[in-house]
Amino acid sequence: MTFKRRNGGRNKHNRGHVKPIRCSNCGKCCPKDKAIKRFIVRNIVEQAAIRDVQEASVYEGYTLPKLYAKTQYCVSCAIHSHVVRVRSRTNRRVRTPPPRFARRKEDTPKPAQPGQAPRPAGGAPAAPRA
């Protein structure tokens, strides 16, 4: 019979049994080697309030602690929440991690597209042609 994945969807090579874990989202039992695991490092304070907390801090140069969480998902929850994506039959064989896209700078103005006139200031529509 043909096979879909080289590893059978698991990381269990030469092991007979692997203990199950519970999915962080739905609580379903899933083998530990089959679960999709992500280690999340976040700031405890949200981005909008970091400056306020640092200014209100008594200690100079106090670094805010981070929140470390390991999440383990079953396959269906990982696909549903877009942690992993369904890939085509040929792309399933690709083992390199997907490219991480860099965040855009929001404060830099976009360069003008070639062949387009600049937009008028104030966001008002241009005068109609006569």
Swiss-Prot record:
Record keywords, A-Z: Ribonucleoprotein, Ribosomal protein
Keyword Magnesium set for record: no
Homology family: Belongs to the eukaryotic ribosomal protein eS26 family.
A GO molecular-function annotation: structural constituent of ribosome
Pfam families (UniProt xref): Ribosomal_S26e (PF01283)
Gene3D superfamilies, per the entry: Ribosomal protein S26e
Annotated GO CC locations: cytosol; cytosolic ribosome; cytosolic small ribosomal subunit
Domain of life: Eukaryota
Biased composition range(s): Basic residues: 86-95
PROSITE patterns with a match to the protein in the record: RIBOSOMAL_S26E (PS00733)
InterPro entries tied to this protein: Ribosomal_eS26 (IPR000892), Ribosomal_eS26_CS (IPR047864), Ribosomal_eS26_sf (IPR038551)
UniProt-annotated stretches for the region Disordered: 86-130
UniProt entry tagged with the keyword Cell membrane: no
Annotated protein name in UniProt: Small ribosomal subunit protein eS26x
Residue ranges with Low complexity bias: 113-130
S-S pairs: none
GO aspect biological process, one term: translation
